[in-house]
Amino acid sequence: MKKFSSKTIKAKNSVKMTALSTRAIAANLILQVLDEGKSLSALIPEVQLSVKAQDLPLLQEICFGVCRVLPRLEQIIKRLVDKPLKGKTRIVHCLLLVGLYQLLYMRVPAHAAVDEVVNATKSLKSDSFRGLVNAVLRRFLREQDEILAIIDKNWQTLHPEWFVNKLKKAYPNWREIIEANNQKPPMWLRVNSQKNALETYRTLLEEQGVSSKTSHHPNALCLDIPIAVQKLPHFEEGAVTVQDLSAQWAATLLEPKNEEWILDACAAPGGKTTHILELAPQANVIALDVESHRLKRVEENLERLNQQAIVVCGDASKPDEWLAEIGKSAAKFDRILLDAPCSATGVIRRHPDIKWLRKETDIAQLVELQKKILSALWEKLKPNGVLLYATCSVLPEENCEQIQAFLNAHADAELLSLPFSDDKSAVGFQFIPQPNSGDGFYYAKLLKRAS
């Protein structure tokens, strides 16, 4: 099989987003994920103004798709290009990833996909690569069956080895988690019970030709086919919120009551804050997050649902600082929702770039941060108050092991049972990602005993 050489070709990989094609922008974003450790969730909003509205779904599909199946695409390139495209030529490597993803996974005519990617070399100031890109993609089309037979001979996880090893240790059904992660996520809605009954809103969807199914959660609907949020009936009026099924249990398990003081720690982007206020509209809610720019999303969601909360920028591990700033130094809370900073390994199917951004060394640091926040907020919980600990992780060290260590260190902490857990010996409850169901999520509900 012929390989193509890149050894005599040079290109720049620093390009402006203006006037770039969608494929060129996708290659640039993928480059920033792989080489600079940036997340697609942060990058895509930054370039939305540079992309036509009708092309934004294409950009998202390419970027998230490439990250989802990255190892497979990398192996194909390795078989077709004899020398790695490094340094200033990395942008062309990412452009090949874009082209191969389209050829393998998208309903784009092969000739059109190749032509678009080849033409993108010019706007990326890599026109000297035009011939290489064209030759690699066209040879792949000719020899696709042979190449894939070799690459796919062994079962591929499409995940980093360190993560697979952790799953094998923790879960007998670890392959199910891997397979769910490699699929596109379902679109779940949370129906605002202050506006509509679940079946009433489901009927509104059906009237627009949108089919859905219910679940074991009283406010959740799963769309059979995802649609743009702008097409959801009465979305702007706050009738519905896009939120994963597993995440919808947070406010439900917290059981907020009107007039209570409730802290939503690590609140951005505000899905759980608004759900708390749907369940208890007269509750006094503080929505806290350490990143000020992410709190803008909280404020936007509160405004859309016509709700009120105290939105605070502060470090959850240092509550005395931000409580003093808002004039509530002596305040203690009836309930605390701690959706702790975590590895996000339970939401890989929604954010496949996590597979390549997260490092094994991150886990110990996150565990220590969770421990610090948990202990600090426990001091701000009233006697007989409830703290709900949550993560979107599937790793035991962040979840059941973290909570067991906390229980061992705090005699006033009592683990409460959860309605969907039959195992009385379990420390909290772990959702794993499943097709047509929720993401990976962990919950533990703690009562602070009165002394």
Swiss-Prot record:
Catalytic activity from the UniProt record: cytidine(967) in 16S rRNA + S-adenosyl-L-methionine = 5-methylcytidine(967) in 16S rRNA + S-adenosyl-L-homocysteine + H(+)
Residues annotated to bind S-adenosyl-L-methionine: C266, A267, A268, P269, G270, G271, K272, D289, D315, D339
Keyword tRNA-binding: no
Main localization category: cytoplasm
One of the GO biological process terms: regulation of DNA-templated transcription
Annotated PANTHER family: NOL1_NOP2_SUN FAMILY PROTEIN _ ANTITERMINATION NUSB DOMAIN-CONTAINING PROTEIN, NOP2 YEAST -RELATED NOL1/NOP2/FMU SUN DOMAIN-CONTAINING
Gene designation: rsmB
Catalytic residue positions: C392
Keyword Plastid assigned: no
Function of the molecule: Specifically methylates the cytosine at position 967 (m5C967) of 16S rRNA.
E.C. numbers: 2.1.1.176
Positions of disulphide bridges: none
Record-given protein name: Ribosomal RNA small subunit methyltransferase B
Any one GO molecular function term: RNA binding
NCBIfam families: PRK10901.1, PRK14902.1, rsmB
Keywords for the protein's UniProt record, in alphabetical order: Cytoplasm, Methyltransferase, Ribosome biogenesis, RNA-binding, rRNA processing, S-adenosyl-L-methionine, Transferase
Membership in a protein family: Belongs to the class I-like SAM-binding methyltransferase superfamily. RsmB/NOP family.
GO cellular component: cytosol
Organism field: Haemophilus influenzae (strain ATCC 51907 / DSM 11121 / KW20 / Rd)
